């Protein structure tokens, strides 16, 4: 994956170290204590990412950090601050303001740049945690990580040529004819067959490998018929290859209700990007909140592991934020590196 020439410290692993913003720095410090304690043979290389980099360079994920990731085995990531378009532009240093720079989430860009197509979110109740909703919850969420509304194909105002093509292609666009371009915003939900099949197969393979009994596809095909319909249809096809695993289907709204009512009856959930973002946070709260919510962004040749909480700037530097999500993310990284004994 990288040139192991003599210019590098000859550790077994080279790990990109991306603290980011706010409490991301704090929890990464906790992770380093654990990694040093277990004696992982690794070199940790700092990478610039996040809000301060955006403010000073108008790019929260600079090319030098992309280069770093291309030269390492995997990455650990802390947290980032993100703000809406206008606020982000206003916080640039003065010399960069008014030049048309647009903030985009660096973690979303990382997922797309390295095709980290699978977002894996284990949500397990650990014994003795008083914040557990129930003590018998063991849910794993598989969230497609690079498509859906997170593809970034958005318009505001909506250009005339986009409206013209859509109007000619779909009669339901006619009801918006009287709405001015500047009064309309549009985000495209894009799902590909291959993207669906990849995340679905990952979910079934995981279910089979670790002895889970069911996979539930979570979508909204009764309303979002084409995109959610594609995900559900592909799940049904792939499920036929795994005869010992029960396939369940649930609409996203009903799924949220059933997870609150009977979370212990579910094991592996598979869904698209936005719905996965929503349902995984719900599942996290069932087992103690985001302080226990680890995740892996996993592709064919690279992976980035991170807690799912935000940067919580008001707590930065105070070491008040629960580091367990970060430590569980470290465990996921060790498993991915086949360092099971250390995990």
Task: Please describe what each predicted stretch is.
Residues 63, 101, 258-343:
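Glycine-rich phosphate/nucleotide-binding loop
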């Amino acid at each position: 994956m990288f040139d192991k020439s003599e210019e590098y410290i000859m550790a077994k692993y080279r790990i990109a170290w991306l603290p980011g913003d706010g409490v991301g720095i704090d929890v990464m410090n906790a992770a380093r204590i654990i990694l040093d304690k277990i004696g992982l043979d690794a070199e940790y290389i700092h990478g610039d990412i996040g809000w301060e980099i955006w403010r000073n360079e108008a790019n929260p994920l600079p090319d030098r950090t992309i280069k770093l990731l291309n030269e390492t085995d995997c990455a650990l990531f802390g947290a980032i601050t993100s703000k809406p378009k206008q606020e982000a532009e206003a916080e640039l240093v003065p010399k960069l303001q008014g030049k048309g720079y647009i903030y985009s989430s660096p973690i979303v860009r990382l997922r797309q740049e390295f095709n980290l197509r699978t977002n894996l979110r284990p949500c397990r109740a650990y014994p003795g945690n008083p914040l557990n909703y129930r003590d018998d919850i063991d849910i794993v969420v598989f969230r497609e990580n690079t498509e859906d509304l997170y593809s970034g194909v958005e318009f505001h105002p909506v250009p005339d040529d986009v409206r013209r093509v859509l109007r000619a292609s779909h009669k339901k666009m006619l009801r918006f004819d009287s709405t001015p371009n500047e009064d309309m915003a549009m985000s495209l939900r894009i799902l590909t067959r291959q993207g669906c099949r990849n995340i679905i197969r990952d979910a079934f393979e995981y279910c089979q490998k670790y002895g889970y009994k069911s996979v539930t596809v979570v979508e909204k095909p009764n309303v979002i018929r084409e995109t959610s319909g594609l995900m559900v249809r592909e799940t049904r096809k792939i499920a036929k290859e795994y005869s010992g695993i029960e396939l369940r289907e649930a609409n996203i709204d009903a799924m949220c209700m059933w997870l609150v009512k009977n979370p212990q009856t579910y094991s592996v959930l598979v869904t698209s990007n936005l719905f996965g973002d929503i349902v995984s946070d719900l599942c996290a709260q069932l087992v103690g909140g985001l302080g226990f919510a680890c995740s892996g962004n996993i592709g064919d040749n690279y992976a980035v592991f991170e807690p799912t909480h935000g940067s919580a700037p008001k707590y930065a530097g105070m070491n008040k934020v629960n580091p367990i999500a970060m430590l569980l993310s470290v465990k996921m990284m060790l498993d991915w590196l086949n360092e099971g004994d250390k995990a």
